[in-house]
Amino acid sequence: MESPLIYVMLVLLNVFVFSSGVIHNKGKERTYFSCSGEGILTGLHTIKLFLTMDNLKVRCFFRNENQSPSKEILGLFTSGGLAPNMIITNSTFYGGYYFKLTPFSNRLEWLIDIPRQNITVNTDIAAVEQWMIKITMHEGLNIYDTEGTLLDLVREPILQWNLGRVLTEMEVRDLYPEVNDIKVTKSPCANDVALIGFMMKPSSNGVFIGKTISGFWTYKECIWHDLTEIIYAELKDEHQGLTVIDLVLTNHFLVILTSLGLYVSSDLRYPTTSQIKLSRAEFCGFERVDYIRGNLWYNEKCFANRESFEVDYVTITFNRNRTLSESSSCFFSKEPFLHWLPCVFSTIKNEKSIPRVITFLIDQETDSGIYLFNVQDTKETYVTVAMLKDGKPSPRPKFPSFHFPSTFTLPLGMIFHPRSHFLYVYGSQIWVSMDGGNTFEMLCNLFSHHVTKTSNSFYTSDIVFIVEDGRILTTKAGLTTYSELGILKDAIFTLYYDQLGYIHKLTPENFDAGSKLLGHGNSGSIFGKRPDLGFEAILVPQYISTNEMYFFAHVPLTMPTNIQWKKRFKTIHLGKTIEFSKTGLANIKNVYMHKTEPVGFQTSIHTEIIVPFGIENSKDSPCLLSDLEITYSGKLYYTIKLLSKNPLHELKSTDVEKSVLIPGYSSFLIMNITDKWTASALATMPQAIKSNLKFLTGSWFLYNFGTAGGRKWSISTRQCNYWIQQDSLDFMSLNLVKYIDVGNTIDFQFKIIPKAMSTFPIPPVSMVVGNPGLVEVKTQGVFDLNENYYLDIHVSGRFFQKGSTSIALVLWEGSSKCYAITLLPTIKSSCSYLRTMHHTPGRHIPPEDWISGVHKDSQGFNMIKTLPINYRPPSHMGISIPLTDNFYHADPSKPIPRNQFHKSKETGKYKQCANVTSRAMCNCSEHQKFSHAVAFSDCKEKVHRFKFPVTQYPVVLEIFNERDKISAEPPYLVTMTEVNMRKNWQLKHNEPENVKKMKHYLEPLLKTPVYNPLGLNLTIQGSELFHFKVSVVPGVSFCELSEEFQIYVDEVPLPFPGHALIAVATSVVLGVLIFIAFVFQLRNIHPLKALKKSIRGNPGLTSSTTVSS
């Protein structure tokens, strides 16, 4: 036997591994934080914060479900040095911020104050993701956290417009009796921003739309607008009977279908007026009666950080067949929705044979169009997928159409689950496709009922189907099972999911989000207690093993055929839990239908036993103390005889409807008692009985799953049965977006932890790739000794092709009560907005020294140069003749130096400081002042300073991603230019054979030298400012990677051209001197001797005379 120490070590190892990363489906604590920002306190178990141009100020209380906030609670934590922190995330961003340790306002609150620029520096109007926030605090082994949202009010497009006259509370109340239905649409990137429209009765008139910024948490928060006059401004004749029919809010446009036409807003990102503008789209031949029966269809996608291939499409369908004079009864358009094209062209002359387009959706992942067709005369329903060519569907299908069975009699619509590739077709049945419409699997058959509306949550992957009888069916994206949330009796209502996945019931006069909100989407007060999915029928257990059991549902042989369905197991029971009142719990693995045998049992379920079911004892059924004999009576029934004649062991009337279970043999349902020792029964496995059977007491058992005295068993949604552990930084979001560049790869790691029975050796997770032609996905999974499942996913790009695809990870055995069953990362084969290239200077200068402008080396040389005001670098014509357009350290109020020559006056243009009169009006931010980009040269004040000459300066380039960085090296070859057209510099680099081949190929195409960034060195022979731009060659990255840096060369001996002139003059003088010396030597002239004599002075002359006689 192995040492117990090994098992202890394994358990501890599992605990330590489990404690790292992010774990979903853990459940919620009964303690939470209540937070508010700028005086807005929701008072709910979720937090709604709003970001304006000011700082984000958040105050938080610590609450307990049965305890109000108090000084004592806060004091307990702060005395231990504890304070919460706030995590802000979305699909591409993760940031952590910390509250002050000392609570605010007399130790009653924690306070945090975050400048806007610490969260985002952008202020332009655009589709931007709403942030998820989590307030969390650790205390010992306890973790307290509360989730919420943060909405940017500055950037959300629809919030920048006035939708029309604001209605008073009394005016809104007057509309309630006239409302016929309600329609809801939400912002694709910020689901808390939503619009609700009233569909009025024919006797009323007007377009009334409500707007919320907090996800309809309270009715008072919703602002109602009257758009009637805005619509009337576009109408020429008919004004009566105007009402909302449908509405869609895309990333950048609002589309409203009314009874008098279709109206499209201008681009919401560019408000030219305060009031929204709507234009009418014309459809020839369609009138008010057609618009009333029309529908809008939209595949919801969030286009935050929008790519060039991302565009919204909207479809309008009219619930009628087209006439021979009309091109189509279905039209679609892409933004800006100016031109509407027919979804399909048909040349069929027989009107009844023309397939009617019920729905047409654009699948943006595979760039295809998906049709849901219905043929009137044949009652045929099918789905066809066509590729898009030049923005139009091709008449040739992508693959053969999928035809639904004839039992699908009422198809009504088709939708994509948002941000995924799961396609749902609904009506009298619900079908789901995992492969974009190629194949479908039936999820639910509603028989005589049908689905009227749907609602979904991208965050929790929930999707609900509203049935016309008020039932609410729900499932998770990718699951092939469903359950029932409950029944709503409201005459007019719809359901809506907010950003965090909480479900809301909306009626004309009230919004209900539920009162118990501990968990994602847990709104028990809306539906009440989840319904018992059981039915009034006798169940017979059939033993398979200690872990498995079948249950057969008995249908009386005399029961009318038309109501026999009431006593059958159905597809809704798949994946649920069957529970016995005495004791016993099992998960339903499969549902089976039986056509002939066994007689009396039309359906059965296969279960996995979690808790053994309780058996009858001898006190309740004394017959258990007797031996048993079973024989076939020849009339469908089997005869059960008690071999003991002891009066204390006889059968009782209460034994009717009980089941006889014998391990290894068929089970029997006692139908009636003939006498004290004999009963007739039905067998669950009659084909397995070959002869008479005898069993000793203790070898057979009785179960009571009958209905006499009330049903003792129930079926319900099983509890959450899996934990999902992810890397804490890579996968903070359930719907993260990852970018993959050319030649790059992405790796994900997950750990699936079963809370009950494991699926070993079958992997518990399935994976669906939306566009498998875009990326290559490899997986590797393994079970550990504790039957936890580890999954590694490796994603790499296939071609130099831009696009996006979802990768769905579905826990197919998971319960819908887990909020995280489906993980939906999106892979974009494109350039990440976080992917940049940076030059790493050879020396580090602290930020505080940059601010002061002084950083000296060991020799006292200041390594920072503060540029003169309105500075421009020299040109090849001289220091005083700058020819560049770029100003540095610009100040329009100051004179421009070096501006005497005509060519210098013609050049030089302000950018940031254009059309202003002072530097303060340039609005240069600190980021712009320190930026190396030529676009911000007006703001640039300080640069790196070097002594002349600069030789072999290493140009070190690094490419940064979200979390890591790599050195720029082949194949990332680069080009380098000086933005001010200066010449006195040169580069040296390494040229291995592969680099030479790429240079020979690229340089003729680019018409510029190409360099290897690895080992690149720069030499500068000129003076003053050099501004370089390094760019990665095209074709090796989706990103246009470039970097700029400046070098100021100072302490040059003499500026050009003085140095050369002195050299020439010196040479001439030396030459003249040599020539003069040569002439003196030739004439025997000795200038030095003459010079010496002149220094001594001239002596007196003497005379000598001789006279002879």
UniProtKB/Swiss-Prot annotation:
Transmembrane helix recorded as keyword: yes
Principal location: membrane
Membrane topology: Single-pass membrane protein
Cell compartment(s), UniProt: Cell projection, Cilium, Flagellum membrane
Keyword annotations from UniProtKB, A to Z: Cell membrane, Cell projection, Cilium, Developmental protein, Differentiation, Disulfide bond, Flagellum, Glycoprotein, Membrane, Spermatogenesis, Transmembrane, Transmembrane helix
Record field: transmembrane: 1056-1078
Cytoplasmic side: 1079-1109
Pfam families: CATSPERB_1st (PF21541), CATSPERB_2nd (PF21548), CATSPERB_C (PF15149), CATSPERB_head (PF22830), CATSPERB_Ig-like (PF22831)
Paired cysteines (S-S): 35-60, 189-302, 330-343, 720-818, 831-1039, 913-922, 924-939
Topology, Extracellular side: 1-1055
UniProt xrefs under InterPro entries: CATSPERB, CATSPERB_2nd, CATSPERB_C, CATSPERB_head, CATSPERB_Ig-like, CATSPERB_N
Biological process per Gene Ontology, one example term: sperm capacitation
Signal sequence extent: none
Tissue: Testis-specific. Specifically present in the principal piece of sperm tail (at protein level). Specifically expressed in the seminiferous tubules but not in the interstitial cells. Within the tubules, it is expressed in spermatocytes and spermatids, but not in spermatogonia.
Miscellaneous notes: CatSperb is absent in sperm from mice lacking CatSper1, suggesting that stable expression of CatSperb protein requires CatSper1.
Function of the molecule: Auxiliary component of the CatSper complex, a complex involved in sperm cell hyperactivation. Sperm cell hyperactivation is needed for sperm motility which is essential late in the preparation of sperm for fertilization.
Protein name in the entry: Cation channel sperm-associated auxiliary subunit beta
Gene: Catsperb
